[in-house]
């Protein structure tokens, strides 16, 4: 009965070495006893007194059923290979009960199927129960993993949005720094020309005029550069003050166009300053050339007159000459 209720128990029972051979021997012993009673007292006496064969029909049917349940397990079929001839002899017996012979024939059928992948009904039911028990556990694990991954995905999305929102401001600042650097680089040539002009005009009489012109030009350049830088700084202050979250492609294009216009204005101012410095340098050079070609100075004239005049004779005393 235990073997019939559970396929695992059937496997355990079948692994006992004398189990199958003992059950087959029990049925064979009953069949031999029944054959002796039939030969001695006749078949009718055996039918009227089935207990005369040493056991009851119920016990024989129970033993045959146990063999059938053991044979249904795929792993036990190899254990019945040695008992096939004995089982076939019981099936072909004309004395044994027909129901017992039918059960044994089913045992032979299960053994003939071999050790294939086909499992018994009990084994399939056990597998279904195990799968049903594993499914809720796997569903709970998947739900827990999904619940744990959802906040991580939300945090990753928030960090991505914050990084994209914070990116436009550094671009504007770098553009402003580049523009300021370009303006400062454009303002360098006037200072260099000022140094050259001041060095060339140190030995001329027009040094004061040139220096005053250069100081005026330097003041004009500084005012232009300060105005350009102030306008640039105003633009850079107003541009980043806008909220980075609302910046769109149109606003970025407007900021870049304004920066280009400011850079163009600064370049024009620097070019005008360079032209004014060049004109001042040309005027200083012309004044120096005129001074070198013109008449000599008063100091040189007085020196020449002193050299040309001869030495005057010493004064004489009128009284002395008359006395002599």
From Swiss-Prot:
Residues 1-126 form the EHD domain. It is found in: Nucleus. One of its GO terms (biological process) is imaginal disc-derived wing margin morphogenesis. InterPro entries: BAF250/Osa (IPR021906), BAF250_C (IPR033388). Residues 154-175, 195-226, 287-310 have a biased composition (Low complexity). GO terms for cellular component: brahma complex; nBAF complex; nucleoplasm; nucleus; SWI/SNF complex. Keywords: Activator, Chromatin regulator, Developmental protein, DNA-binding, Nucleus, Repressor, Transcription, Transcription regulation. Component of the Brahma complex, which is composed of Brm, Osa, Mor, Snr1/Bap45, Bap111/Dalao, Bap55, Bap60 and Bap47. Interacts with Pnr and Chi via its EHD domain. This is Trithorax group protein osa. It comes from Drosophila yakuba.
């Amino acid at each position: 009965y235990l073997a019939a209720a559970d396929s695992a128990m059937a496997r355990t029972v079948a692994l006992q070495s004398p189990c199958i051979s003992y059950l087959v021997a029990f049925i064979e012993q009953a069949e031999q006893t029944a054959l002796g009673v039939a030969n001695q007292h006749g078949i009718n006496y055996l039918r009227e007194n089935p207990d005369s064969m040493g056991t009851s029909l119920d016990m024989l049917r129970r033993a045959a059923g146990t063999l059938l349940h053991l044979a249904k397990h795929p792993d036990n079929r190899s254990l019945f290979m040695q008992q096939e001839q004995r089982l076939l002899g019981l099936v072909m017996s004309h004395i044994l009960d027909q129901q017992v012979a039918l059960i044994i024939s089913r045992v032979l059928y299960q053994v003939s199927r071999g050790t294939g992948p086909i499992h018994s009904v009990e084994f399939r039911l056990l597998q279904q129960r195990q799968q049903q028990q594993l499914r809720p556990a796997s569903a709970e694990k998947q739900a827990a993993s999904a619940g744990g991954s959802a906040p991580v995905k939300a945090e990753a999305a928030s960090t991505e949005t914050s990084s994209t929102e914070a990116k436009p401001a550094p671009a504007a600042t770098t553009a402003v720094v580049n523009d300021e650097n370009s303006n400062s680089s454009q303002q360098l040539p006037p200072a260099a020309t000022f140094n050259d002009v001041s060095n060339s005009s140190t030995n001329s009489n027009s040094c004061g005029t040139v220096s005053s012109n250069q100081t005026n030009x330097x003041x004009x350049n500084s005012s232009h550069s300060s105005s350009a830088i102030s306008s640039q700084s105003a633009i850079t202050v107003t541009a980043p003050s806008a909220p980075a979250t609302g910046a769109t492609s149109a606003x970025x294009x407007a900021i870049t166009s304004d920066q280009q216009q400011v850079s163009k204005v600064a370049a024009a101012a620097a070019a005008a300053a360079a032209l004014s410095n060049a004109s001042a340098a040309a005027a200083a050079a012309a004044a120096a050339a005129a001074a070198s070609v013109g008449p000599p100075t008063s100091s040189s004239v007085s020196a020449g007159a002193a050299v040309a005049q001869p030495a005057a004779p010493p004064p004489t005393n009128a009284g002395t000459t008359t006395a002599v």
